[in-house]
């Protein structure tokens, strides 16, 4: 499967698929130890009493900020009336993955939204 977003610094590499799920985490040797074993890490929200994982229902715009290696993703769920704006990067010097997330309500109402990140690591090929 092709990767829609690739972020790395030569030692630490994170790849995202078409649904904005992390599919690969390589560290400290890119191409040798994939700490996900190719299994997706899910990303979703809890709103209005239910959890919604990012899937085919969400509209997705996945790309890079112009002239950078910073990922820029917009996720929209029309039925929920939510838009998520995400910026992702791997630091060039420190092996750190950073994510900035902005939640926008498209209905014009104040609502309580929780963000869920489901990470299922396989460190060095071991089910952790």
Description of each model-found segment:
Residues 1-128:
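Terminal accessory carbohydrate-recognition/targeting modules of carbohydrate-active enzymes
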């Amino acid at each position: 499967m092709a990767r829609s977003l690739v972020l790395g610094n030569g030692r630490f590499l994170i790849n995202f698929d078409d649904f904005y799920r992390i599919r690969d985490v390589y560290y400290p040797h890119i191409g040798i130890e994939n700490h996900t074993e190719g299994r997706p890490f899910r990303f979703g929200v809890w709103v209005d009493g239910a959890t919604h994982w990012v899937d085919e229902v969400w509209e997705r715009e996945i790309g890079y900020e112009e002239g950078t290696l910073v990922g820029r993703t917009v996720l929209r769920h029309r039925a929920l009336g939510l838009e998520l704006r995400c910026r992702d990067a791997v630091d060039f010097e420190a092996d750190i993955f950073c994510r900035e997330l902005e939640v926008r309500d498209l209905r014009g109402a104040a609502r309580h939204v929780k963000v869920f990140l489901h990470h299922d690591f396989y460190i060095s090929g071991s089910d952790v």
